[in-house]
Swiss-Prot record:
The chain crosses the membrane at residues 17-37, 53-73, 116-136, 159-179, 238-258, 261-281. It comes from Mycobacterium tuberculosis (strain ATCC 25618 / H37Rv). Its main location: membrane. This is Mycobactin import ATP-binding/permease protein IrtB. It is a multi-pass membrane protein. It is an enzyme of class 7 (translocase). Part of the ABC transporter complex IrtAB involved in the import of iron-bound mycobactin (Fe-MBT) and carboxymycobactin (Fe-cMBT). Transmembrane domains (TMD) form a pore in the membrane and the ATP-binding domain (NBD) is responsible for energy generation. Required for replication in human macrophages and in mouse lungs. Disruption phenotype: Mutants show normal growth in iron-sufficient conditions, but show a growth defect under iron-deficient conditions. Its EC number is 7.2.2.-. It holds the Pfam family ABC_tran. Residues 1-16, 74-115, 180-237, 282-579 are cytoplasmic. Residues 17-299 form the ABC transmembrane type-1 domain. Forms a heterodimer with IrtA. Induction: Repressed by iron and IdeR.
């Protein structure tokens, strides 16, 4: 855990980290010396020359004050390091997420990333003062006390030194017991978080299916798993605590027995033995403190583990190339491209090659799961091919830096996401520097102006989280306006009309067709009515382009596209007749 935390310390604070470690060690030495000085103090106080106790009292006072000062300075530096780690870590996590490969964002990893950002503040800031310092004391203070006892009684010093690995081993074993169960509990808590969020978001579907009781849903299973994991955690903590308790009692018996034997034989005086009892308590105190901090230590370990999992998540390696400025409409080319997701059963695309001419509109059609959306993702640079190249005007997309990849493409997703804010904010997110006239043109083309006209607050209407205040068709229109506002030479549309009614579908199709900006357009469609303006059609099946041509050419050929077209037209003519 400490190694993980040290790795998170910014480079410009490493010198302060070294200073913190040195001061913490000096503080431990001061406290150990102050503890052991009780022995000569008591011996002098009850000896033949009590006035000599003033000397030892002075040394004890000096050691105590030095310990206070060192602790105060160490705590201040520790808090500074905590805030530095917090700021550095949150920025690192935020910077890492945009370049992490999209297939990493499973439900579990998404919850991990959310917890890594949201739950790190108090733990990281207080980690040094509340956990690192006590943990360091538990390891160093008993050992330093044992070394300081050697000049007083080598027998006691050896016994105390022997007790250090015994007690640390018991602490380690106790933590190992708890850690195994805590890992399962942490996974169960993460799964429960995701299931509760899912349960809240899908209430409409659950109520329609009469499955609103948590016990009958995945939430019920997650709650049961979390309960089992919690009980296991408690069950594993108890044996660990008993083990440490036994080790502490054994260490106390050995030290007390050694002190008693040395006192009986006359090696130690009674006042020295009494003082050594206090030293024994101080010797065992750090171990007890750390055992009480075990839950907090495991919680912090889990937090650092979540941060580490995000910071080590696989990333897309972007190039360093830039995209030329200007309004040049590019050519898009796939050169023997293959792609597969990690852990997938096989390639999603295999041997895909085609060339899309500048300024044309190409429709990609095919059955569900054939790889249509993956082609768009590769053009946009959201994924990188496992084989082959994706070229834009002869430039490999993989060689472009992230900013260039973002500048080339404007994307309309099948399930658009609107940020919590106004309609204006969401449209301007594509190009914050756009003018009001450009904004007005984009919302008019996407027919968002009709929506704005009937809303009391117009373009300043709050859309809610993920656009929840708008209907599905309205959200899609806003996303179309956002895509049209961006001055990108490539426009990618991923099944933008698949879940829309006829009116909204017509509005979206007309908006894309009326866009006056010269672009190379690629439209993925499942409903063929939305591709009537396409210059070219690629029919994809099982990860390969099986047909390529214009709509009329493919219909005349009588192949897969023709069959697809005929099936949809027949479905559109279905009617329910009343008898």
């Amino acid at each position: 855990m400490i190694r993980t935390w040290i790795a998170l310390v910014p480079n410009d604070h490493r010198a302060r980290l070294i200073g913190f470690a040195l001061l913490a060690f000096c503080s431990v030495v001061a406290r150990a010396v102050g503890t052991v000085l009780l022995v000569p103090l008591m011996a002098a106080l009850f000896g033949e020359a009590p006035q000599r106790a003033w000397l030892w009292l002075g040394w004890l006072s000096a050691a105590t004050v030095a310990g206070w000062v060192l602790d105060a300075v160490t705590a201040r530096i520790g808090i500074e390091l905590g805030f530095a780690v917090l700021n550095h870590t949150q920025h690192d996590v935020a910077d890492r997420l945009p370049v992490v490969r999209l297939d990493w964002f499973t439900a579990e990893n998404t919850a991990t990333a959310r917890q890594a950002i949201a739950a790190t503040g108090p733990e990281l800031v207080g980690l040094v003062v509340n956990l690192v310092t006590p943990l360091t004391s538990a390891i160093l203070l008993p050992a330093v006390i044992a070394l300081a006892l050697l000049p007083i009684s080598w027998q006691l010093g050896v016994a105390a030194l022997a007790g250090v690995p015994l007690l640390l081993g018991a602490l380690w074993a106790s933590a190992a017991f708890a850690r195994r169960a805590d890992t399962a509990a942490d996974k169960a808590n993460t799964a429960l978080t995701e299931r509760i969020i899912e349960f809240a978001r899908t209430q409409q579907a659950l109520r329609a299916a009469r499955r609103v009781e948590p016990a009958r849903s995945l939430v019920g299973n997650a709650l049961a798993s979390q309960h089992t994991a919690t009980m296991r955690l408690l069950g594993m903590q108890i044996p660990g605590q008993l083990l440490f308790s036994i080790a502490s009692q054994l260490a106390l018996i050995v030290l007390a027995g050694t002190t008693a034997a040395l006192t009986i034989t006359g090696t130690l005086t009674v006042p020295e033995a009494i003082a050594l009892i206090v030293v024994m308590v101080r010797y065992l105190e750090p171990f007890t403190a750390v055992s009480e901090l075990a839950p907090a230590l495991e919680s912090t370990r889990a937090t650092l583990g979540r941060i580490g999992s995000v910071l080590t998540a696989p990333v897309m390696v972007a190039g360093s190339g830039t995209w030329r400025d200007g309004a040049v409409v590019p050519r898009i080319e796939f050169d023997d491209v293959a792609f597969g997701y990690d852990g997938g059963s096989g390639p999603v695309l295999d041997g895909v090659s085609f060339c899309l001419q500048p300024g044309t509109t190409t429709a990609i059609v095919g059955p569900s799961g054939c790889g249509k959306s993956t082609i768009l993702a590769l053009i946009a640079g959201l994924h990188q091919p496992t084989r082959g190249r994706v070229l834009i005007d002869g430039t490999d997309v993989a060689t472009l830096d992230a900013r260039a990849q973002q500048a080339v493409c404007s994307v309309v997703f099948q399930h658009p996401y609107l940020f919590h804010g106004t309609i204006r904010d969401n449209v301007f997110a594509a190009d914050p520097g756009a003018s009001d006239d450009q904004f007005a043109q984009a919302v008019r083309l996407a027919r968002v102006d009709e929506l704005i006209a009937r809303l009391p607050d117009g373009a300043n209407t709050i859309v809610g989280e993920a656009g929840s205040a708008l209907s599905g068709g309205e959200r899609q229109r806003v996303s179309i306006a956002r895509a049209l506002l961006k001055a990108a030479p490539v426009l990618l549309v991923d099944e933008a009309t698949s879940a829309l009614d006829a009116e909204n579908e017509a509005a979206v199709v007309d908006a894309l067709a009326a866009d006056p900006r010269s672009r190379t357009r690629v439209i993925v469609a499942h409903r063929l009515a939305s591709i009537r303006h396409a210059d070219r059609v690629l029919f994809v099946d099982d990860g390969r382009v099986v047909e390529d041509g214009s709509i009329s050419e493919l219909l005349t050929a009588g192949g897969r596209f023709s069959q697809f077209w005929r099936q949809q037209h027949e479905a559109a003519e279905w009617q329910i007749l009343a008898e």
